[in-house]
Amino acid sequence: MKAQTIEVTESTGRILCCPIFRSGGKKLLAKGHLMCDEDIRILQSEGMENIWVTELEEGEIGEDDAVRAIASDIICGCFEVKITAGGRANLLATENCCVLVDDDLLKQINCTSSLVIATVLNFSYAQAGQRIATIKSAPFAVAKSDLDGLAALLKQRGPIMQARPLRTPTLGVLYCDPISGERARQMFESIMRQRLERFSIPTPVSLSCVEEEEQVVRSLHSLLRHRPALILVASSTAPAGPEDVVGRALARVGAQLERFLTPVEPGNLMMLAYRDDIPIVSAPGCFRSTKPNVVDLVMPPLLAQYRISTWELACLGHGGLLA
């Protein structure tokens, strides 16, 4: 691709390298515009004689075609692609969803490609219609070899992103307190409602009990029979580890501990376990506050039926200082 200044009369079929404005300041033609005969007549009527343009050479693909070619390959799930002028593709969620991002692959592409990609954070909750990523090409054109290399990398490594829908998931909640389960319910229920409204989650299946091992075990078994997408244990006492009352109860119902302690503040004392494919979160004390905490970070992927690993919890430490 070679930019040059030529006579306006010779510019048909070439790409405008800079915007053109009328004398009064109103934009006449945008950068990247493909010139046609009508444009030439307009510019001549404005008294212009020369124009700065470029044209595609063999082995090059126009900026809009380049982002269009790759947009659907970087993501899977509930999304749509919107192409805008100037070599940009926006990816929008078509349903309420959780966005998962392969950070290593994203960095690799952004270091080596003639296209760059910006996304929302991994594990982000997105509402239908929200922009979750944008792709921008180098100005005017991209080498076909670059595009082919990017396509091959995505075919080998898979998409950079997933938009996993949250389709009215069922949530189970267990309120517990050493003295009275209803005391914990009164302490948490209003806050729980506000938190669930953020994610458009319907009214959960909820139980309350005294924080005593046998009662917690019975309550967990009862909630598990509903097959919820997620069970939250909201206790008036902060988790103390797998040997506390809730931790022992989790083991007795067959749940496997994934991780106790998370590098997120507020929320260091969260405990995550799985009973088969059902995640169970023993919420830390900060859950009593409406302010963002670790539970807000892990709820979207868990509600989208994504199994969070210990490694992924560890990765939350970068940016995990929320307050």
PLM-predicted stretches and their roles:
Residues 1-145:
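Phosphate-interaction motifs
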Residues 48-49, 86, 128-130, 167-171, ...:
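Short coil/turn connectors at secondary-structure junctions
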Residues 204-323:
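Short glycine/threonine-rich loop/turn motifs
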Residues 45-49, 72-79, 128-137, 197, ...:
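Generic secondary-structure signature for well-ordered alpha-helical cores
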Residues 31, 94-95, 135-138, 174-178, ...:
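Fold-independent oxyanion-binding glycine-rich loops
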Residues 139-230:
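Phosphate-binding glycine-rich loops and their immediate beta-loop-alpha structural context
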Residues 8-9, 13, 27, 81-84, ...:
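Solvent-exposed alpha-helices and their adjacent loops that cap or buttress functional pockets
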Residues 36, 59-67, 125, 185, ...:
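Generic structural signal for well-ordered, non-membrane alpha-helical segments
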